[in-house]
Design a protein with these regions (language model features):
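Domain-scale selection of a single, long terminal region
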Residues: 1-14, 228, 245, 306-307, ...
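N-terminal periplasmic/intermembrane-space "pro-region" immediately following the signal or transit peptide
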Residues: 2-75, 81-89, 260-263, 456, ...
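Residue-level signal for beta-strand positions within conserved beta-sheet cores that form or flank
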Residues: 19, 68, 170, 400-402
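Outer-membrane beta-barrel pore domains
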Residues: 25-32, 37, 42, 47, ...
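Outer membrane beta-barrel
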Residues: 52, 56-233, 241-260, 264-277, ...
Length: 461
């Protein structure tokens, strides 16, 4: 067979196969096109980015009953902290910071986080797992030359919970999650107005716990009630002495205007209407009477802790305002009852479509006997004041997905005493010390005028 004959034979075979398709009527052609489009839509949804660009990538079946979302946070920061030379010593008036450490500068990955979420069986059965990739070091030493803080590297489990929403507005959550007492902690660092959460949040935040939460959401009201292992008890076993014997938390919120999603952050973009929210949260726990022997250091003394917070938010077209009053009382078998209070005021306004200016005030009013009783033990000063001013530049308008933040945290008075503000003379304290704090850049100063400059780039994916 010649080459020309072969070509003719192949062409004829191709025409015979294509002839039925060419002979299709218009209805058959439209049906076939619709089938192809449906198949393409199903395949493209397997790895589709969320519309906002900051809610992760989603893998889903066609029904939507099984869905997996993968996302994360990367915050890269440059910090410059300037302060007076440290005051040697370990008492309430000392900084516990090396005398030569009047200037600290450098880069850090302030937050690197990855999270998985979605639903199984149906959209009402949801789950979330998140982990923090931790690799930070606090290069601060006390008078004896010992390092303050520890170096941790690796994955740290944060959230690990399941949740089911009922048709009547109720929901139940179980696992490891944030306690709902303080709104700033609920919102988190990624959606904070400044480069990070406040010193107040560092002191009072109940953090994550393991437990059960019952929730209810209506048109203008929602509430949460938790029974848990207590504040800051994430990643502990039931035999751990650091856990509370029992703990209960509750939070209620009234939405005056706007949608609930408006209060997932503190910012209000120019294309958003007026919104207002009033909320209050409480937490109470009793500990130290069980698990003693498994962790003798943490379960040596009985203790009772009460935490409460009242907050309000106003948001408009391109502006926002927020206020919160937070207080606590810590009482124990072998320590005094200590009460501490705080006030946070903050607000922001957009000056362009992408640029937002903001300011924040923090006042912390501590019990003067927080470090003990008697002459020389009183905390002086017992009030601490901070002012933060800065700007956010949203690379993608109306989205936190790519954001540059520049701010300065100014200590109005000396703040070295914040390192003693642990509200306890025993190891079972549940509150954090205010300094040194690499999140807000404040390392502690025996004089007024410490300033921490922060320049941060954020990516959410």
């Amino acid at each position: 067979m010649t080459k020309i004959s072969q070509i003719v034979l192949v062409a004829g075979a191709a025409l015979s196969v294509a002839a039925p398709a060419l002979a299709q009527n218009p209805d058959q052609s439209r049906a076939y096109s619709a089938e192809l489009a449906a198949d393409a839509q199903t395949r493209s949804s397997l790895l589709a980015p969320a519309a906002s660009g900051s809610n992760g990538f989603t893998i889903s079946d066609q029904s939507g009953n099984y869905k997996l979302t993968i996302g994360g946070t990367v915050q890269f920061r440059y910090t410059l902290d300037t302060r007076s030379d440290g005051v040697q010593g370990t008492g309430p008036g000392a900084t516990n910071i090396n005398k030569d450490d009047s200037l600290s500068t450098g880069f850090s990955n302030s937050i690197t986080r990855i999270h998985f979420g979605g639903n199984i069986i149906n959209p009402d059965m949801t789950f979330k797992v998140s982990a923090l990739i931790n690799g930070s070091t606090q290069n601060v030493t006390n008078a004896a030359g010992a390092a303050i803080g520890t170096t941790n590297n690796g994955f740290v489990l944060e959230d690990a919970y399941g949740q089911y929403k009922f048709d009547n507005g109720f929901s139940v959550k179980w696992g490891q999650f944030k306690l709902p007492t303080i709104r700033e902690e609920i919102v988190g660092d990624e959606y904070s107005l400044a480069a990070g959460t406040s010193t107040i949040n560092t002191l009072f935040s109940p953090g994550r716990t393991q437990g059960i939460e019952l929730g209810y959401t209506a048109e203008s009201f929602r509430a949460m009630f938790d029974f848990s292992d207590g504040m800051r008890s994430a990643n502990t076993d039931y035999t751990n002495g650091a856990e509370a014997d029992y703990a209960m938390s509750a939070r209620g919120e009234f939405k005056i205007a706007g949608d609930w999603s408006r209060f997932n952050d503190f910012t209000s973009f120019r294309n958003q209407d007026f919104a207002a929210l009033v909320g209050a949260g409480i937490h109470w726990e009793q500990g130290g009477n069980t698990n003693d022997g498994f962790n003798g250091t943490n379960a040596t003394f009985g203790n009772e802790t009460f935490l409460y917070s009242i907050d309000g938010a106003l948001e408009g077209s391109g502006w926002n305002a927020f206020a919160a009053f937070t207080g606590s009382n810590a009482d124990g078998d072998q320590r005094n009852s200590i009460s501490t209070y705080s006030l946070l005021l903050q607000g922001g306004v957009f000056v362009t479509e992408n640029c937002e200016l903001f300011a924040r005030y923090e006042g912390i009013f501590a019990d003067s006997e927080v470090t003990g009783v008697g002459a020389g033990n009183e905390l002086d000063p017992s009030d601490f004041h901070f002012v933060t001013i800065g700007s956010n530049y949203y690379i993608l308008p109306d989205s936190h997905a790519a954001k540059i933040t520049a701010d300065a945290v100014i200590s109005v008075n000396e703040n070295a005493g914040l390192q003693n503000l642990v509200q306890s003379t025993s190891a079972n304290n549940k509150f954090g010390a205010g300094v040194p704090n690499t999140n807000n850049g404040v390392l502690g100063d025996g004089d007024s005028g410490e300033i921490a400059f922060r320049l941060q780039f954020q990516l959410l994916f």
